[in-house]
Amino acid sequence: MEKNVTPMMRQYLDIKKKYKDAIIFFRVGNFYEMFFDDAIEASKLLNLTLTKRENVPMCGVPYHTSKEYIRKLILFDKKVAICEQAANSTSVGPLEREVVEVITPGVIVDEDFLNDDVNNYLVAISDYKNYYSFSYIDLSTSSLGIMFYENSFFEKLKRDLEKYSPKEIIVSENFYYEYSEKLNLNRFLINRVPAWHLDKDVAIKTIKEHFNILGLSSLGFDEEKPYYISIFLIINHIKNNLKNLLSNIDKIDINNDSLYMFLDDVTQVNLELVKNNNDFSSQYSLYSVLNDCKTAMGKRLLREFILNPILNIPEINTRLDHVEFFCKNISLTMTLREAFVNIWDVERIISRIQMKRYIKKDFLFIEKSLSVFFLVKKLFDKHNFDYWNFDKFEEDSISKVYFLINSAISSSSDELIKRGYDLKLDSLKDLKINANKYIDEYLESERLLSKINNLKIRKTNNRGLFFEVTKSNYAQVPPHFMESQTLNSSKRYKTEKLISLEANINNAEDSVVAFEQEIFDEIASNVVKHNKVLKKVAEFFAYIDLVVNFGYLAKKNEYKRPILTCSKEIFLEKSRHPVVEHYVKNTEIFTENFVKINKEKYFCLITGPNMAGKSTYLRQVALITLMAHIGSFVPASRAVIGITDKIFCRIGASDNLAKGESTFLVEMNETANILRNATEKSLIIMDEVGRGTSTNDGLAIAYSIIEYILEYIKARSLFATHFHELSAINHKAFINLSMKIEKQGNELVFLREVEEKPSLNSYGIYVARIAGLPLRVVDRANVILKSLGSRKDSSCLEFLPCISSDTCDREVLKNDTDVHVKLNEYLELKKFISNIDINNITPFQSIELLNQLVLKVISQSS
């Protein structure tokens, strides 16, 4: 096949060999063409018509609409290599072409491909010589950071994969083969690099060159401890695939785990912090409830806060002070929220400008945003709000950027640079716009000078502009006219000024475009000089938007300021679940509950039926604890919360078919992780541990877990269970809680209110009935339950034959009552029949009883 290909196709095949894992967008004129397997795959994903030329499958998309097709491929986790043709190629043969960019899900900077409120991370994981590290980069926001895993490598890595949800991961081949299955890495787009590629000396050289430093110590690294290999993997990957896309990265954030609350991957999922567990969108998550931010930067910071609760009480209180200020000054809060609508994504715009990916509107958006910045300063001064971390030099720098853009960039759709900014550009624009006017003015001046009234200026493609003089006026031709052509009835002349005017007019259009772009690029360069202070402005906007948002929500939702302490306590009065309350507020009133945990009484066992609110109560405590640690007010009338180093949440049942793990094995793995890693300062939330196995095994395991937590870990714990036997545990730190139930006739009302006593019944059959199980099944379950209650000492094996024997009450099974008959009506009928003493009634009484029975049956079936 390759022997008979055209020169252009040979060029394509050579390029494809270098980018085997990417779909090549091969520029041909005004189209991007795809060939061979790329064309087959792209045609299916993009719904394009697949054609053939000389047996080569091909499809294409127009250049001017290519962005939307690229975006769709990125959403399918595909890599796209953009291969452009040279603009002014002089070589013989096909036009010169080269790949100018490889767009992948992890290195997107185009705003059309990004979600405003979510960071777009590329991650690299390194295990070089057992120095484990995790590096992440979001090119769109200039964020580059690293975590050192000095211990608990596996648990922390799982946590961070969930937290950062990377679009793309770089790992060594050895790491991939060892951990791919354990970490389920194939859910991500993976870039595997050969093990020999991880070289310490090459890594040091690459990092030093990028940051223009003499040694890695200036970045916070010890060169003898090569955690920085993961940073090298990121830098090298981007340099090999993209051009000018690292110029915005000028620092590395080295994350300190000890500053933040530990939330493992299971807890992040079970608490539905930033996405729900149904469709994985943000709806019904804590983030969705707390997110009423007005800026994209504020929304992203909120996600970061939720996933990284802090442990420093003074820092938390500073945030709470700011939230309280805006909660109390609601008029200012509403003014700011209205103004924040005009703040654009400065963080991403500055990154694009640094990477030379800017367009005109980026600068106009910065100008609008900075005008809000000055307004915020005035409002803060007026209301004596003391959060202002800009000095005079920085304020002057911000003003320079604002006035530069304001004076230079035009908001008019048909103009880039404003008139008056550059005199030379203005003259070129005038010449371009008024060319005919200048020609007419010059013609009129020569008519007056020569007295030739019918003097004309004409133009041909070959000769350009010239004066035309008829025979009768030859004697009046001025001496500075230079004859260029003689015709039968006239002569054509040029002058130095006409030649110059024509040249200026011809060059004006190209000159305007080129010179305007030159000025535009110069303005961009000047703005980039202020990138550090502009990034600081972006951080300021994000934080202020977030605390204003928290203050607004506190006022709107009646949240209260939590008190953070160093004690082992959680005290909540009239607490509510923030998410459930938010989504049911239009249909019902959420039931408030108390929580009382301290160093003496720190383990709560919660019993009660399903649907009574146990799981909601558990999550409620965890979410309120987390909200307090991010600096938010909380849904409670009063909250006192001891600093919590870790939250563990083991709720729900699921299996892991990919790993061949049963529901019970998953449950035990998660429980083992909690028991290994929890400390006395942790909060443990566990729901229905032990239900994935036999009753006796489950009860024994649950009892042993509780005992271990009480005696060895001593963490604040809430443990929901259906094993009522556990309520008999006798320990000084043990508290029995249950969910209140009110019986109204044969109906149960779940009050969803916690009380300090154990529950003696799960009411499972009642729940099954209201869930819609066939009445025949429900009735049979009641019979079996009663039989079980009378045979407490019998084993299950002894009992099963018994309930299937002739002595068992088979009336329920024979009963062909319609499934819609209510259970209480059936029980009433059964009670009526059971009370008949057939040995002591007269024939007349029996007829009367039979008549009553018929009437009851008729009334119940009607």
From Swiss-Prot:
It holds the Pfam family MutS_III. InterPro entries: DNA_mismatch_repair_MutS, DNA_mismatch_repair_MutS-lik_N, DNA_mismatch_repair_MutS/MSH, DNA_mismatch_repair_MutS_C, DNA_mismatch_repair_MutS_clamp, DNA_mismatch_repair_MutS_core, DNA_mismatch_repair_MutS_N, DNA_mismatch_repair_MutS_sf. SUPFAM superfamilies: DNA repair protein MutS, domain I, DNA repair protein MutS, domain II, DNA repair protein MutS, domain III, P-loop containing nucleoside triphosphate hydrolases. It comes from the Bacteria. One of its GO terms (molecular function) is ATP-dependent DNA damage sensor activity. SMART domains: MUTSac, MUTSd. The keyword DNA repair applies. GO terms for biological process: mismatch repair. Keywords: ATP-binding, DNA damage, DNA repair, DNA-binding, Nucleotide-binding. ATP binds at residues 608-615. Belongs to the DNA mismatch repair MutS family. This protein is involved in the repair of mismatches in DNA. It is possible that it carries out the mismatch recognition step. This protein has a weak ATPase activity. This is DNA mismatch repair protein MutS. It comes from Borreliella afzelii (strain PKo). The gene is mutS.
